[in-house]
């Protein structure tokens, strides 16, 4: 089979104004980035259409390092809905350069279920990540300058919380010292870098519903702590307007297309393990305004991305998915059942059955939120009919719908059965309100405990002393009502990536809380998770090259 990039190049793209026309977007509102990409205005949001849309959330079992294929299935499903006569628009996150050149590779789908132009989307796209990186680091520079220029007046901060960001995987930047050299080179300070998808500006942009809301959120971002234990914010720095100006274009969603011409809004890119893992609220609302069945994705497994989509994004945006689709693979289930590789067939079968426990917990979790659930198998060429039948029968026992899909090889045609099942499920179940995992007025400790115990299956939550100190501050600053975003490994329900399947008898250790006053969430750091990833021994960058003017090896 052709590579992803070869498939993408072999399919003729429509001009972006033609894609816009299929979604009912007037050509004169498009801001073109070449022939095949454009930004669209927030004025396209129609709250009445949003309220009536049959939003479909795509999530998955806990992923393996080989991936599960949520983005590919999301793209294929939206194309399939259009193929069966429904009106569908897709909303996805933007890829990050860090994983693209690191371990994961690109994030524009795969096979015959891709968004295009895939090279541009996977690389610099329309510059949103650059704008977010620039805005975040501009705040860091302005804060350092403020401290430097006002030191003669006795001004200083007890603690600076604001780090810098960069859209690369670079472990050597996690902890740095700035301001070395002469006295004119700034004041020495211990700091560090996070990856751009973990930036609070990324989160705020993805949760803001307007430019004014984004400016308000930027004003409230906490940069440091004064000696009287008060928050020092961007408002105190007096630069919220300047930072918002840097993001004026970045807040507008990007319109592209799938290989079959389905309109796709690709906008924002927080990771689900270290951030809230959803594309922008405005992109989702525009997709809902332009269609009857909007399809969107939440990152990693349902314990991370879907929980945060429902508890954070839906709480803020007052949107309600009509169904959650859980993507799985036989290979992934076997790995959750303890399969290492090379075992005899009978051991593979047993591993598959034992791996069902991971799927079961994700199904129960989504049902806990009041979500109707459909399970879809992302098919591989070596899947056997016997094993597929086992999974189908197991889903029947769980009382949830099941459909295979083969969108990687067949595009939208490979998900038509899945699309019909989803439409039937939505029609049968009707609209249901989300049952959130916690209430707004729960304390931060209660929110963390409810997620850890009820969603992850943890025995208890252990708070490190540093986390306990942060909680005192959160209480004192009146931020208890913020939702909680737990940063945790994506490979396990626990904080240990090696505990696959449905982990039991484990505790969740919270070692720190990050106060996101602008994004209006409290990030709880669980276990050893890092907000600046490192590169693997053999990064994807070694496979990428340019040959006779064409990019090769990007996947």
Predicted regions and their residues:
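Flexible phosphate-sensing "switch/lid" loops adjacent to ATP/NTP-binding sites
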Residues: 1-555
């Amino acid at each position: 089979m052709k590579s992803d990039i070869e498939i993408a190049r072999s399919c003729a793209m429509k001009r972006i104004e033609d894609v816009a026309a299929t979604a009912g977007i007037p050509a004169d509102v498009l801001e073109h980035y070449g022939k095949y990409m454009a930004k669209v205005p927030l004025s396209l949001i129609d709250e009445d259409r949003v309220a009536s849309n049959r939003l479909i959330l795509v999530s998955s079992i806990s992923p393996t390092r080989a991936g599960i294929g949520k983005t590919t299935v999301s793209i294929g499903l939206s194309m399939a809905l259009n193929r069966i006569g429904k009106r569908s628009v897709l909303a996805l996150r933007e890829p990050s350069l860090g994983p693209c050149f690191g371990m994961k590779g690109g994030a524009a789908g795969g096979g015959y279920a891709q968004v295009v132009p895939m090279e541009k989307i996977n690389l610099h796209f329309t510059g949103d990540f650059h704008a977010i990186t620039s805005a975040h680091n501009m705040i860091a520079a302005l804060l350092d300058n403020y401290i430097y220029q006002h030191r003669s007046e006795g001004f200083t901060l007890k603690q600076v919380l604001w780090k810098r960001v960069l859209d690369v995987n670079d472990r050597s930047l996690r902890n740095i010292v700035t301001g070395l050299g002469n006295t004119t080179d700034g004041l020495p300070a211990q700091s560090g870098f996070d990856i751009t998808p973990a930036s609070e500006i990324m989160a705020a942009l993805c949760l803001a519903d307007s430019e004014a809301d984004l400016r308000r959120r930027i004003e409230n971002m906490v940069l440091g702590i004064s000696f009287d234990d008060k928050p020092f914010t961007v408002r105190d720095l007096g630069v919220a307007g300047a930072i918002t100006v840097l993001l004026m274009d970045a807040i507008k969603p990007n319109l592209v297309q799938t290989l079959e011409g389905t309109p796709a809004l690709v906008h924002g890119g927080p990771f689900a393990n270290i951030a809230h893992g959803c594309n922008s609220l405005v992109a989702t609302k525009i997709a809902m305004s332009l269609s009857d069945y909007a399809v969107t994705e939440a990152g990693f497994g349902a314990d991370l991305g879907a929980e945060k989509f429902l508890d954070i994004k839906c709480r803020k945006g007052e949107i309600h998915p009509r169904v959650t689709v859980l993507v799985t693979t036989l290979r992934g289930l076997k790995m959750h059942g303890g399969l290492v590789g090379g075992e005899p067939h009978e051991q593979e079968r047993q591993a598959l059955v034992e791996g069902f426990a991971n799927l079961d917990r994700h199904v129960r979790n989504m049902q806990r939120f009041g979500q109707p659930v459909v399970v879809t198998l992302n098919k591989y060429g070596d899947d056997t009919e016997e094993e597929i039948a086992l999974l189908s029968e197991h889903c029947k026992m769980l009382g949830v719908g099941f459909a295979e899909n083969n969108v990687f090889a067949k595009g939208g045609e490979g998900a038509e059965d899945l699309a019909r099942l989803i439409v039937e499920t939505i029609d049968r179940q009707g609209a249901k309100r989300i049952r959130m995992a916690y209430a707004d007025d729960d304390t931060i400790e209660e929110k963390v405990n409810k997620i850890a115990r009820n969603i992850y299956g943890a025995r208890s939550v252990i708070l490190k002393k540093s986390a306990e100190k942060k909680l005192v501050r959160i209480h004192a600053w009146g931020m208890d009502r913020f939702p909680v975003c737990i940063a945790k490994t994506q490979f396990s329900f626990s904080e240990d990536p090696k505990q696959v399947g449905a982990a039991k008898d484990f505790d969740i250790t919270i070692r720190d809380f990050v106060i996101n006053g602008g994004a209006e969430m409290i990030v709880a750091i669980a276990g050893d998770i890092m907000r600046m990833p490192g590169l693997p021994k053999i990064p994807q960058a070694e496979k990428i090259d340019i040959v006779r003017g064409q990019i090769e090896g990007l996947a």
